[in-house]
Amino acid sequence: MEKKPHFVRREFLPREVPSTSLALLLAAVLLLNALLYLYLNKFYNSLGRVETDPGLCPFGHFRFGAVKNCSPWLSCEAINREVRKLKCVGEGAVKKVFLSEWKEKKVVLSQLTNSELKEDFLHGLKMLKALQSKYVVRLLGYCEQQFTILTEYHPLGSLRGLNETLHIPKYKGMNTWHRRLMLAIDYVSVIRYLHSSPLGTLVMCDSNDLDKVLSQYLLTSDFHVLVNDLDALPLVNRSAGRLVKCGHRELHGEFVAPEQRWPYGEDVPFEDDLMPPYDEKTDIWKIPDVSNFFLGHVEGSDIVRLHLFDIHAACKKKDPAERPSAQEVLDTYRKVLTLLIREAAMPGTREML
């Protein structure tokens, strides 16, 4: 009698992953998160919530270049004796700017050109002295009698030249959504600092169009943003009921905030005395337009804009009271940067899993 083959049913159990592989995978994920944390922590420290740089010199002093010791601001005598003009590199309504040399180092010498605007010039000097921090160009010296100011030189110039700079081969690696968003964060950090400065709430008045805004800021060689021009920085004092007006002329265009425009229509001629004052929320209105310039049109910038859509919509609220504070905008920008960096890092981790 022929025996029938006897088939044994075998259950195929799920394939087990060796515990050592899981441990290595978990370690890799933890290491990735640790590195990300350290990077973001270093980044936030570089921006800092502390207004004054820990390495900043005492009031009336400066540290220049790699020199560790602090030196007193240069006096009239020292400027006249030690600073040599090289060439004129700019001229505005208030002052002329000269690339100069001091002890074989490039510096910037600014001189008043219009005596009628000396109050603006001296106001700018006062602000520069009082607001020395990681957000403000470094003051090296001044001479009130001769209306001259000496500051640190930044070869990349104002933010107006940002896109041209990013197309230079040396800096093309910086032309990413990540670096551009960091510049926008720097800019908002400056606004937040001015709104909570040691002097009180200051409004950046020299900002009636995008080009004018960009001209007020410098791009440093390590790609950070510094405010450079503080000639028009009035103080808001709510407790005293004091608001501000940016100049005495009628302002036009969508770039300036609605409350900065003449509210009584074209049939009523503009009169400065009838123009209502306003507060620092005019600066908030302009943030989306300035940030849009920073973000440019590189790969990934549209994703950043999408994540910033809600906060930018809030910045554009017609009622100034409904707009966020500069601190709220800054917090949102930082959260978006953290989120996008995590998303950029996680795809590799998901594939490992």
Please state what every model-predicted region is:
Residues 73-130, 136-138, 144-146:
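ATP-binding glycine-rich loop module of kinase domains
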Residues 342-353:
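Regulatory extensions appended to serine/threonine kinase catalytic cores
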Residues 205-268:
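Activation segment/activation loop of eukaryotic-type protein kinase catalytic domains
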Residues 189-208:
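Protein kinase catalytic-loop region centered on the HRD/HxD motif
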Residues 301-318:
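Conserved C-terminal C-lobe helix
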Residues 138-183:
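Conserved structural core of kinase catalytic domains
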Residues 2-88:
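Juxta-kinase regulatory segment immediately upstream of eukaryotic protein kinase catalytic domains
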Residues 318-344:
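Terminal C-lobe "cap" of eukaryotic-type protein kinase domains
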